[in-house]
């Protein structure tokens, strides 16, 4: 059986499209829990009226009494999900009709801890702005992959038992975890297989108010200091995964993967802090350890404050 959980905050503009896409799934969820985090627009009214209009007896709307933030609201939702398989949903997205059926099938066939699919990117008008190339095949992903390329929460489905143990062990409070998809996505391989279904299953909306992604994150609009702060957080995050992994007695392969990820991130931090080209040379020898080549280029851009140059090149040649 399936639970779908979704956090909302001032999502009135797009929430009805997402509710429709969940309600009309070919494999209907057995439980939908929506937790609103003190919205000041019409989000709550729209959801309440929607549930009443469609007589959705298995849907529940909860309102936080105080603003908990995105992370704590999703942690709360994970604890409230009742069924064996749990899907996370974002308020602005649209699911394709076979999303729940496709991910449940892979989860059951592979006995995985977590499965995830791929997403179109759409703009505020619902127009597709990016369509990733996909194979349609299922691929197992290891810890090394997920430390660098964890899926976004809206793409995922988990076994409830995995979420329950993470919550009961209070891994939610470990340093570096501030997004539910980072927490659950990085820890899932410590509990079993993680499988990517390389198939487009939803449409993720990009707009100015997004929590997960905005135009600035794609355009070198941050600073060297913000990059340093981010890498320090990543190091804390990897240290937390390492400590949890040691508790769970994982394989030597996973230990080596964690060590490589920590070594690379520490080297990146040294480079940004010192601006010493010597460290850049060291990073070039480890470039395959980066998530993408763009991350290496971004380190160079932020270290030497080349943001303006990078933006002009992006504008001229495209992404």
Give residue spans per PLM region.
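C-terminal subregions of glycosyltransferases and related glycan-biosynthesis enzymes
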Residues: 172, 177-178, 203-319
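Glycine-rich, basic loop-to-helix element that forms the pyrophosphate-binding segment
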Residues: 64-81
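Short, well-formed alpha-helical segments that are part of the catalytic scaffolds
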Residues: 11-25, 30
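Conserved nucleotide-sugar donor-binding catalytic segment
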Residues: 139-218
